[in-house]
Amino acid sequence: MAATEGRSLSHKEKVSISAALAAATCSLLGTTFPASADAQEAGDWDFNTSILYYGENDDRVKDYSVKSIARRMFVDDRSLSLGLTVDVLTGATPNGAIRQDVPQTFTRPSGSGFYTVPAGDLPLDDTFKDTRVALTANWQQPLGETSLVDVGGSVSKEYDYLHLGVNAKIARDFNQRNTTVSAGFAYSMDDLDPVGGAPTPLTPMLDVGDTSNRTGDQDKDVLDLVVGVTQVISRNLVVQANYSYSYSDGYLTDPYKVLSLVDGTTGDTLLRSGAIPAEGGPSHQFLFESRPDDRSKHSLYTQAKYYMDGKVLDISYRYMTDDWEIDSHTLELRYRWPLAGDHYIEPHVRYYTQTEAEFWRLSLDDSQPLPEYASADYRLGDFDATTLGLKYGWKTRNDHDMSVRLEWYQQSGDVPGEQIIGNQAGRDNYPDLDAIIVQFSFRF
């Protein structure tokens, strides 16, 4: 299809080209602006469902997820969207402690038991089991001929976590519907009830049954704001740019993460005085992590989609910076290649890189005063991640959309040289992570 300059696009042409870009803005807020009102008649229900498996190497985290979104059209282009997500998570996750040449014993988060990690192994907490149920609801309707508003709410529940949220977005067309400006917000109130209680930051892990350094429920609030513009350049090209701001306030610490307190010369974790691990208590000195109680994030996002003879090139870039001194870059590329009979394939490449938080530590040196904040959570460290994937999609005889997606995720991190002490130099301090993602989606 050759580019056609000098005329505005019809409403149907503009919807069909820019629909996928609208989802990128909404994903920042958790709102849902479905693809095309022209595909449904008033009174019809449209269902979009996916089943996903995510599995990490070395028997780490596994996620089995089912997600379904139902959308009903009403007269005058109004619509209601209802969403349900169920996640079942199992496996083991790093607890933050470093490897040692001797076995290490840890008190379980509940305080009612303990587990032992063999010498040389990465300390993993194998009590990572949870089920999350999330519900969303959004109402969308026009405001006049050129504006659209979407309002909604969300609730999700895990064993130790409750989320309540609201969101809203407004979008308006200009320039003969070739330019769309949008703005939105989301606000959430989250309540945390950690298993065994929330530990006092930077206090030691205690014996089984000793909860003297634990407190009760914690909470946090999160505000997200976004403004953006989508521009149709031609019949082949549409671009988008937006800016988002996120502010979190409250309990941002992970109550299940610890740091190793090490000898300032050898780098080995200090033994706990009088510890008898076989009787139920930590073998070494581990301190619970501490994070600031607020966080501000700024993000810039750009995306372009180019249509050429049925093929679609989709490229995007995101830059994020926050006051924890984390800077990240995300570059993503998709290329949709049509096949015969309404079939297609879509290769996918994603590259992500980030710097470590200013308070990230591999371990804590016992010869130095304790910092105000410290975390060994690898998610706050310096790492790069690459995702390679392939999606295969088709239409059924009943005109239903089906697709299968397979992706491989690889993450590798780096520890600043000045943080490595003594014997730590010979250990795998930031192990690589590999994961497989398989997803089956269908729409009817």
Q: What are these regions, as identified by a protein language model?
A:
Residues 41-47, 76-82, 133, 145-149, ...:
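Outer-envelope beta-barrel architecture signal
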Residues 46-52, 83-85, 140, 150-154, ...:
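Transmembrane beta-strands of outer-membrane beta-barrel proteins
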Residues 51-55, 86-90, 153-159, 172-174, ...:
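Transmembrane beta-strands of outer-membrane beta-barrel pores
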Residues 60-64, 83, 93-99, 153-156, ...:
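Outer-membrane beta-barrel translocator domains and adjoining extracellular loop/strand segments
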Residues 62-66, 129-135, 162-166, 219-225, ...:
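Residues that define the transmembrane beta-barrel architecture of outer-membrane proteins
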Residues 72-74, 141, 172-174, 231, ...:
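Residue-level signature of outer-membrane beta-barrel architecture
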Residues 83-135, 180-236, 246-249, 348-393, ...:
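Outer-membrane beta-barrel translocator/channel fold
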Residues 392, 431-444:
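Outer-membrane beta-barrel "beta-signal"
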